[in-house]
């Protein structure tokens, strides 16, 4: 990684901004519209601050902040069955939201890809580690796709819509 002239990877300003956005995302994650029994919920757009930060600061900051957010989610609302599942469901899944930072000029594509990445990490975890929760006769792949897709599709639509509003109102451009 390239260090700045001060010998740091991130400036104090970017670290402070990252902490604020992760904190905001965490607070929003507590405002649940619906929660599922093995983890996952529809929230008050808790992914938006992380996606916005990724779009604002690019992939390096976005991936870092999103991974930190995943670790914070692990600490505050853990659902643990296996160490590999923990990695997939927290730092990897949430970390993939930072992919949005690669698409600063196409925010809706970036947000869609970040959320899709998160879905695939949760989906894989569901197939491998949560198959025992699938009702009898339902293949684990179908179960995981419906379980994870059900809440992430709604959460994703909410997030994409809010990012669209921020983009349409030029708020994203003001803060980039």
Question: What is each model feature region?
Answer:
Residues 25, 29, 122, 126-130, ...:
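Juxtamembrane/transmembrane-helix interface segments of polytopic membrane transporters
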Residues 15-20, 48, 59-67, 86-87, ...:
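Hydrophobic alpha-helical transmembrane segments
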Residues 28-42, 68-101, 126-135:
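Interfacial aromatic-anchored transmembrane helix boundaries in multi-pass membrane proteins
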């Amino acid at each position: 990684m390239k260090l700045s002239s001060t010998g740091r990877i991130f400036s104090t300003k970017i670290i402070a901004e990252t902490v604020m956005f992760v904190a905001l995302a965490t607070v929003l994650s507590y405002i649940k519209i619906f929660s599922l029994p093995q983890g996952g919920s529809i929230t008050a757009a808790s992914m938006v601050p992380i996606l916005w930060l990724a779009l604002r600061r690019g992939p390096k900051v976005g991936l870092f902040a999103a991974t930190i957010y995943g670790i914070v989610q692990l600490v505050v609302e853990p659902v643990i069955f296996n160490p590999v599942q923990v990695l997939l469901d927290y730092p990897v899944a949430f970390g993939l939201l930072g992919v949005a930072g690669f698409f600063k000029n196409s925010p809706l594509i970036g947000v869609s890809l970040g959320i899709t990445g998160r879905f695939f990490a949760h989906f894989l975890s569901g197939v491998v580690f949560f198959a025992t929760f699938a009702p009898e006769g339902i293949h684990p792949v179908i179960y995981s796709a419906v379980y994870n897709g059900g809440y992430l599709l709604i959460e994703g639509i909410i997030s994409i819509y809010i990012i669209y509003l921020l983009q349409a109102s030029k708020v994203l451009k003001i803060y980039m």
